[in-house]
UniProtKB/Swiss-Prot annotation:
Gene name of the record: aes
UniProt subunit comment: Homodimer. Interacts with MalT and MelA.
Organism: Salmonella schwarzengrund (strain CVM19633)
Function: Displays esterase activity towards short chain fatty esters (acyl chain length of up to 8 carbons). Able to hydrolyze triacetylglycerol (triacetin) and tributyrylglycerol (tributyrin), but not trioleylglycerol (triolein) or cholesterol oleate. Negatively regulates MalT activity by antagonizing maltotriose binding. Inhibits MelA galactosidase activity.
Annotated NCBIfam families: PRK10162.1
E.C. designation(s): 3.1.1.-
Protein name: Acetyl esterase
A Pfam family that the UniProt record links to this protein: Abhydrolase_3
Motif (Involved in the stabilization of the negatively charged intermediate by the formation of the oxyanion hole): 91-93
Coiled coil: none
Keywords: Cytoplasm, Hydrolase, Serine esterase
Protein family according to the UniProt entry: Belongs to the 'GDXG' lipolytic enzyme family.
EC main group: hydrolase
Length: 323
């Protein structure tokens, strides 16, 4: 699609989102478009420092968890001494960027709003690690904490998964992997998904939206996919194209959030409509005037904080509902 035919989203954003787009951090250099992947990872970490400031204070603990691929770093956020549930968080970043620090504020806010222990998983990034390594690392982390619950004062009977963008795909894929492989790590009471991609190769929203402002042009999306997958056959895997999985049964309750001007919004719409058609518990909410990745900007956007609180409320409601 010619760029001229796309929706001019920058003229339609909310005032809050526009303020974020126009905000310039003092002393921040330009994005290293021609830099190698490690340079881009370091820039992303630097750029996110401002957005992670002034986060709630709470007890945190870092733990290296053994997996078949080696140790994976996790960070436990404990807002209170005892927890009624665990929420595992998978960060976004197109499978190639991000870590526990780039999403620290998001995890702290989720821990505060749910009152539960949030465990961030620093899964191995692509292209150094290819599908399905990040999923298998996540499953290994869940298995580890289910076996060492007393050591960490965890309640592993009720667990959930959460993630943004690529992390949302990993969150849902990991829950389906546990179901499909009959791996018991606790009762998955909910999955919180913010503006994820779930397997569509093309869509109306991918044609109408996406540009330099969000890093989600068609070329960008192709690059992320090629970095993550081993080969073209993986495109149809039921833990990458989640619409090729069985979404008609035993899908944990899903909170599905989308951004109005996100090229990935049709992934969320299709996921919601599929689950709803098959009586799988789910809730869908679109946040008007927003771009992909708006969850990061709660320092300037009340709607970002609203989206986190909406997900937290969904999770807490499922904590009280026998399943």
């Amino acid at each position: 699609m010619k760029p001229e035919n796309k929706i001019p989203v920058l003229t339609r954003l909310s005032d809050e989102m526009t303020a974020v787009v126009n905000f310039q951090q003092p002393g921040l250099p330009p994005w290293p478009a021609d830099g190698d992947i490690e340079t881009q990872r370091q820039y992303y970490l630097l750029e996110r420092r401002f957005w992670n400031a002034d986060a709630p204070s709470m007890t945190t603990r870092t733990c290296a968890v053994p997996t078949p691929y080696g140790d994976v770093t996790t960070r436990l956020y404990s807002p209170q001494p005892t927890s009624q549930a665990i929420l595992y968080y998978l960060h976004g970043g197109g499978f190639i960027l991000g870590n526990l620090d780039t999403h620290d504020r998001i995890m702290r806010l989720l821990a505060r709003y749910t009152g539960c222990t949030v465990i961030g998983i620093d899964y191995s990034l692509s292209p150094q690690a290819r599908y399905p390594q990040a999923i298998e690392e996540t499953v290994a982390v869940c298995s580890y904490f289910s076996q060492h619950a007393d050591e960490y004062s965890l309640n592993v009977e009720k667990i959930g998964f959460a993630g943004d963008s690529a992390g949302a795909m990993l969150a849902l894929a990991s829950a389906l992997w546990l179901r499909d492989k009959h791996i018991r790590c606790g009762n998955v009471i909910a999955i919180l998904l913010w503006y994820g991609l779930y397997g569509l190769q093309d869509s109306v929203s991918r044609r109408l939206f996406g540009g330099a402002w969000d890093g989600l042009t068609r070329e960008d999306l192709d690059m992320y996919e090629k970095a993550y997958l081993r080969n073209e056959d993986d495109r149809e895997s039921p833990w990458y194209c989640l619409f090729n999985n069985d979404l008609t049964r035993d899908v944990p309750p899903c909170f599905i959030a989308s951004a109005e001007f996100d090229p990935l919004i049709d992934d969320s719409r299709l996921l919601h409509q599929t689950l709803q058609a098959h009586q799988q518990p789910c809730e869908y909410k679109m946040y008007p005037g927003t771009l992909h990745a708006f969850l990061h900007y709660s320092r300037m956007m009340t709607i970002a904080d609203d989206a986190l609180q909406d997900g937290a409320r969904f999770f807490m409601a499922r904590m009280k509902t026998p399943r």
